[in-house]
Amino acid sequence: MYKNYVFDMYGTLVDIRTNEWKSYLWDKMTEMMGFYGAVYDRKELKKKYDLYSAQLEQEMKQSEPHPEIDLAKVYERLFAEKGVEVSPQTIAFFMNMFRVVSTKFIRLYDGVTDLLEELKNRGKKVYLLSNAQSNFTRPELRYLGLEPYFDGILISSEEGCKKPGKTFYQTLLQRYQLDPKESIMIGNDSVSDIQGAYEMGMDSLYIHTEISPECVEDLKSTYTIMDGDFTKIKSMILA
C-alpha cells in the first residue's frame, strides 16, 4: 500500500503529560544551576529562559519561517551570563533533569509496538518526524524502546525547522530519497502533521488524542480516527 510510514511522536506514538510552569521545577533548576556556579533566583531564571528562547527564535525567523530553536543554546546563554563555561554533556544533563522533573508520565499508546513490528516484518520503511528537543526526545526514544524501529529520525531542534513548514518535510524526503506518493504521515496535529503532509503531496492519517491541538474544520487527512484508538491504524493502512 505504502512503502514509507512517517510518524509524529508525542500524542501519536507516545502519551505524555508535562508541566513546565510549576514552581517546584524552577526551584530545583535554580538550585542545581547554583551548584554549578550559575546563581539565579527562580523568577530571574524563568524570565531569562523565556527571554533567550524568544530571542533565538526571532533570530532564526530571518531565514526560516517555521524555526525550531535548540534549547541547549538557551542553557549556554544562561550559564555564560554568569561567567560559567559548561560542556555539552552538562547541558544535556540539565535538560534531562528539566524533562524528568516536569513530566507527570510518559508511555506508549496501546498498539504502538504491534504496529511498528508489523511494518518492519513487511519490509516497510519507518521514519520519525517530530517537533521536539533532541535532548528530550532521543533519551525518551531509547527509554521507550522505540529507537530500533526507525530507519530515520528527524527532530526539529537538530534541523532548525519544524512542521508544518516545507523545509522540515523536504529534509526528510530528500535525505532518505522518499517519494511522497509512496509515503504516509501519521500524526495527531491537524496542521503540523496533516496540512503539512498535504502540501507536500503525501497521504496522511489523523488520530485525535487527548493532547491533540484543536482540529481544523477543513481536515485534509486521507484517513481519520477521532476516538484516539491507535489499534485501528493497522487495518486502515496495512490492507
Language-model segments: residues:
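N-terminal helical cap/lid subdomain that shapes the substrate entry/recognition surface
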Residues: 2-110
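Asp-based, Mg2+/Mn2+-dependent phosphohydrolase catalytic module
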Residues: 1-5, 15-19, 36-43, 95, ...
